[in-house]
A protein has these predicted regions:
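Non-catalytic accessory segments flanking enzymatic or RNA/DNA-binding domains
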Residues: 2-99
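Conserved pre-motif I regulatory segment
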Residues: 86-121
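Walker A/P-loop
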Residues: 113-135
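Interdomain hinge/linker at the junction between the two RecA-like core domains of SF2 helicases
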Residues: 273-290
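Inter-Walker segment of RecA-like/P-loop motor cores
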Residues: 166-213
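Conserved Walker A/P-loop ATP-binding site and its immediately adjacent core
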Residues: 129-165
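SF2 helicase catalytic motif II
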Residues: 202-204, 218-259, 263-265
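Short basic/glycine-enriched coil/helix segment immediately N-terminal to the Walker B
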Residues: 112, 116, 191-194, 211-227, ...
Length: 290
């Protein structure tokens, strides 16, 4: 309570104390945790802070509910760095996919039963992220790598992951900034059969010694037997010598690859007709009229 007073009094914040818990627990021996570890779990789970007073630093507050905080405490004790989407109290409901999105999902699932690659040639705002994640959910892929030339889109993938997997505790997301670390994801996959989506940037992987880079890193990522690799903005960076080297190391014999792009003109020659789903501006306008 003394700590709470320190962070509320100067900002004039009224509070209700709803729950207390000892910070000592047993996991192979006595351990303890602090509030910053719980805050880290909340932040990596996509839960936003509420800043009341930037001058007096009253910024250790989060917009969430008691049950989510209890789960965050439990996650710290279990050695996890985030909550699954199903553990965070949010008012999500199933996505109502448009007919063209349903067609892309259906065609991809059908293609992946007989082949290993698919290209979505779909214009901006098609909903490629949500639709691709629905493919992952429907096909129950255990290990999925999301690869992009634009690391900034991590937040968007993480948010959409929550919208698709809000009802599945057996799916987890991980990246440098959100969700779990790769090591934690793989550990949970091995021990509990967890399904996961790991987000990685092409720039980071290109610097790895495994593909001729200067740094001894990402060895585990390259060694993983990925079930699916989703390449976001696939026309960017994947056709260079280094980009091809990265894909060559990542893709194993049974790995499925789904490439997403609004302008895949440098990729089309590498795909057969039944390996491409197209939704362009003209098709969109026709759909609006009909």
């Amino acid at each position: 309570r003394k700590r709470i007073i320190q962070h509320t009094q100067t900002a004039g914040i009224a509070y209700d104390l709803l729950y207390t818990e000892l910070t000592v627990y047993n996991r192979g021996g006595l351990r303890s945790f602090n509030d910053k570890e719980v805050h880290n779990v909340l932040e990596r789970s996509g839960i936003k802070k509420k800043v009341f007073d930037t001058v007096n630093k009253a910024n250790e507050w989060f917009i969430t509910d008691l049950e989510t905080v209890k789960r965050a405490i439990a996650a710290v004790k279990e050695g996890r760095s985030s909550l699954s989407s199903a553990e965070v109290t949010r008012e999500y409901s199933p996505i109502a996919f448009r007919p063209e999105q349903q067609e892309a999902i259906s065609k991809t699932k059908k293609q992946f039963k007989k082949g290993n690659q698919m290209l979505w040639n779909a214009k901006m705002r098609f909903g490629k992220t949500l639709s691709a994640l629905q493919v992952v959910k429907d096909m129950e892929f255990q290990r999925t790598l999301i690869l992009t030339h634009r690391p900034v889109v991590d937040a968007g993938w993480f948010e959409d992951f929550g919208k698709i997997f809000y009802d599945r505790k057996d799916f987890a997301y991980g990246s440098k900034n959100n969700g779990e670390s790769y090591d934690s994801l793989e550990r949970q996959a091995e021990s509990h059969g967890m399904h996961y989506e790991d987000f990685a940037s092409l720039q980071d992987l290109r610097g790895s010694a495994s593909v001729g880079g200067n740094f001894d890193k990402n060895n585990e990522v390259f060694a993983t037997d990925w079930d699916l690799i989703i390449v976001d903005e696939a026309h960017e960076g994947t056709q260079t010598e280094l980009g091809k080297a990265v894909m060559g190391e990542l893709v194993k014999e049974q790995t499925k690859v789904l490439r997403l792009s609004g302008t895949p003109f440098n990729l089309l020659d590498d795909f057969k007709e039944d390996e491409i789903y197209t939704w362009d501006y003209v098709m969109e306008q026709r759909a609006k009229v009909s």
